[in-house]
Amino acid sequence: MIPTFRIQIRRYLNTEVKRRLYAQCLNRDFDSLLAEVKGIPVSEMEESFVTLYLMKSAQFGHVPSLDYLWHKYVMRHHMIMVNPSLLCDIGNIALQEGKLFIPEQLSSHFMKFYGSNNEYEQYRYELLRIQVESFAKGTMEKTSFREKWKVFLQDLDHTVERDFQFSVRDFPHLTQALSGTDRELLLKMLFSEGKISVCNNSSLPMLLNMILLQEEFELEFKIKLFQNFYTIHRHLNYEDTVTILFKNCKGNGYRSIELMEFVRGNKITTPHLAYKYFLQSIIDSEYYFKAYDYMDLVKKYDGLLEQLRQQE
């Protein structure tokens, strides 16, 4: 009886069944497909189909399929080697959907098969970023921002090149976790050497930017904080910083002009978006006439010149 049973199992994936499975996958009938795949023995499943199914599940965000395929066919049975790009896609979906144990597994899978190849460095960074964000999101109030920042330093700051450019836009959950943190503690983290050293040139500016994005801090404090930080670290990249600050100055022409004088006086590189926020803030305030000092910039942005004329 046992040999007969095995013969029946091996005949499960006949041509008709394979055709149906591929059709369901390509037609995005994932719910029906998942139900059928769960009944197929691992020994009968083909690597090429699992790879296609995993790829399509990630492409169209079918979380139940991703969760099942990843844990059964990748983690438990090690059937397929997932390419770096797909690992990142799965990681972003896992982060979004709260599957917060998966990102660390993705990084381990990547390091096992691709870790020694510098060609895939961008994927390594992306997977580590997702891992850091996953920790920041998953632990919520249970873990302090200081601990979450330590994880960032250990997992990312210490592992990428010194001149790799971090951006606050890539870490929304870590930024959110900073809210409510004691002001004095943040100043200590920003200006004092901690137990874990900071290696990357953009890590501290990113921490500064995270602080500047917090609504709980007043604008005057933010501008002074930037000025004090800049006097210590003059040769770092502040493009994100000045953009955030000028956006914060919306409707406050006085502070906006004060900030611009500091930026120009120190010849700090300023991106076009920051200039646009600056001009908009003074045109919308009682200091609109100061915009005439920057007419070369006003003319570059659609609508600003007309707004200025309407203020006259």
Curated annotation (Swiss-Prot):
Keywords: Activator, Membrane, Mitochondrion, Mitochondrion inner membrane, Transit peptide, Translation regulation
Molecular-function annotations in GO: translation initiation factor activity
Family annotation (InterPro entries): Pet122
One Gene Ontology CC term in the entry: mitochondrial inner membrane
Tree of life domain: Eukaryota
Residues in the signal sequence: none
Keyword Transmembrane helix applies: no
Functional note: Required for expression of the mitochondrial gene for cytochrome c oxidase subunit 3 (COX3). PET122 seems to work by directly interacting with the small ribosomal subunit to promote translation initiation on the COX3 mRNA.
Name listed for the protein in its UniProt record: Protein PET122, mitochondrial
Organism: Lachancea kluyveri (strain ATCC 58438 / CBS 3082 / BCRC 21498 / NBRC 1685 / JCM 7257 / NCYC 543 / NRRL Y-12651)
Name of the coding gene: PET122
